[in-house]
Swiss-Prot record:
Gene3D superfamilies: 2.120.10.10
Subunit annotation: Homotetramer.
Intravirion side: 1-6
Family under the similarity heading: Belongs to the glycosyl hydrolase 34 family.
Segments crossing the lipid bilayer: 7-27
Binding locations of substrate: 118, 152, 277-278, 293, 368
Gene designation: NA
HAMAP family per record: INFV_NRAM
Alphabetically ordered keywords of this record: Calcium, Disulfide bond, Glycoprotein, Glycosidase, Host cell membrane, Host membrane, Hydrolase, Membrane, Metal-binding, Signal-anchor, Transmembrane, Transmembrane helix, Virion
Regulation: Inhibited by the neuraminidase inhibitors zanamivir (Relenza) and oseltamivir (Tamiflu). These drugs interfere with the release of progeny virus from infected cells and are effective against all influenza strains. Resistance to neuraminidase inhibitors is quite rare.
Protein name per its UniProtKB record: Neuraminidase
């Protein structure tokens, strides 16, 4: 083949390759156009997903449904008008307590990222129940958990997570900087109360839907403190009790009426020889009932009830089935403070039913261990120690701690009454165990008028952790 023939042959091959490449490009363009035409045609056939979520936006609860159209999510919204929780129903009749939640936070925290906490409590809106807790700005099994037995520090914050979940950085919502706190929902928004600052001048910061709305300054300059459980709401108003003054003597106690995060009224209790701390409050038939801790001189629990105008009555639970810890053995009760083993105490609760009372208490008379619920049919007004029902919650060989009440409004349950519930803190670590930290998990129960069972639902974590060795 001479040189001219070689050139002609190579040129012909290049031309053929170029033509093939051009044909392929034209085919690619045609296929893209056809694919786009098919996709555009499918827009007339939207696929409706069954997923429905609840979100909070612009102070209005919004029901959102996602419609999947060509891989693009559009949101259709139907606003649900917010309605204030009435709070005027009576407590539901109950025969026992059904297990509601258990977070297993300490067990999971041995290998997972779980907050070091104490003072957990539960509060419910008309849509959900959340666990609130005071963190120590530290995780379990980490060096910053050292020394977290301390109650008040600038690192403590109020946070919340869905009920039954272990409190972690991944599921928790910041609420307030606080070493003492309360929270509740009025049917429209969340009210949070967080107390922080020095012992001689602490300030309570009130937030409504996450926005600061008011503050309350310590009026006795002696460790302003509040409930460590939910406040109580009815007809658009929420109510809380605060204490300022000695933990082992006469202190000052105030009831606050709060609307949309603003204090609209307060009254100081005229309660000589009474001691109120860490009250557990709930609405019942249009009034608020609070059962509290006497850290001064009572092994039975003081109570205060009041209406929306803050007109109040005070007393002590009369039953000889004593509810505090430490306490004497059950015996002769009193409608005033029972002084035997009356010093110190632990946060607790009771539910009043006419002349009767459900009493929650530790099983041990001297340490924060075990837990039980007792029904005393005459215990609110009579001083004997007889009772008719005892339900085991935590065995005496396992640690317990604080306990408190919460309620589920009819707007949440669909019942025509207020469902009584309670939570129990299960404290682990210092000062009773050989660790560098103090934390806790929690369990909760709700009252039912059907079958229940007594058992033990302990924390269950095996200590010490790696950080403790």
């Amino acid at each position: 083949m001479n040189p001219n023939q070689k050139i002609i042959t190579i040129g012909s091959i290049c031309m053929i390759v170029g033509i093939i490449s051009l044909i392929l490009q034209i085919g690619n363009i045609i296929s893209i156009w056809v694919s786009h035409s098919i996709q555009t045609g499918n827009q007339n056939q939207p696929e409706i997903c069954n997923q429905s979520i609840i979100t909070y936006e612009n102070n209005t609860w919004v029901n959102q449904t996602y419609v999947n159209i060509s891989n693009t999510n559009f949101v259709t919204e139907q606003a649900l008008a917010p309605v204030a929780l009435a709070g005027n129903s009576s407590l539901c009749p109950i025969s026992g307590w059904a297990i509601y939640s258990k977070d297993n936070g300490i067990r999971i925290g041995s290998k997972g990222d779980v907050f070091v906490i104490r003072e957990p409590f539960i509060s419910c809106s008309h849509l959900e129940c959340r666990t609130f807790f005071l963190t120590q700005g530290a995780l379990l099994n980490d060096k910053h958990s050292n020394g977290t037995v301390k109650d008040r520090s600038p690192y403590r914050t109020l946070m919340s997570c869905p009920i039954g979940e272990s409190p972690s950085p991944y599921n928790s919502r910041f609420e307030s900087v606080a070493w003492s706190a309360s929270a509740c929902h009025d049917g429209i928004g969340w009210l949070t109360i967080g107390i922080s600052g020095p012992d001689n001048g602490a300030v309570a910061v009130l937030k409504y839907n996450g926005i600061i709305t008011d503050t309350i300054k310590s009026w006795r300059n002696n460790i302003l403190r509040t409930q460590e459980s939910e406040c109580a709401c009815m007809n658009g108003s929420c109510f809380t009790i605060m204490t300022d003054g000695p933990s082992n003597g006469q202190a000052s106690y105030k009831i606050f009426k709060i609307e949309k995060g603003k204090v609209v009224k307060s009254v100081e209790l005229n309660a000589p020889n009474y001691h109120y701390e860490e009250c557990s409050c709930y609405p019942d038939a249009g009034e608020i009932m609070c059962v509290c801790r006497d850290n001064w001189h009572g092994s039975n629990r003081p109570w205060v009830s009041f209406n929306q105008n803050l007109e109040y009555q005070i007393g002590y639970i009369c039953s000889g089935v004593f509810g505090d810890n430490p306490r004497p053995n059950d015996g002769a009760g009193s409608c005033g403070p029972v002084s035997s083993n009356g010093a110190y105490g632990v946060k607790g609760f009771s539910f009043k039913y006419g002349k009767g009372v459900w009493i929650g208490r530790t099983k041990s008379t001297s340490s924060r261990s075990g837990f039980e619920m007792i029904w005393d049919p005459n215990g609110w007004t009579e001083t004997d120690s007889s009772f008719s029902v005892k339900q085991d919650i935590v065995a005496i060989t396992d640690w317990s701690g604080y306990s408190g009440s919460f309620v589920q409004h009819p707007e949440l349950t669909g019942l025509d009454c207020m469902r009584p519930c309670f939570w129990v803190e299960l404290i682990r670590g210092r000062p009773k165990e050989n660790t560098i930290w103090t934390s806790g998990s929690s369990i909760s129960f709700c009252g039912v008028n059907s079958d229940t069972v007594g058992w033990s639902w302990p924390d269950g974590a095996e200590l010490p952790f790696t950080i403790d060795k």
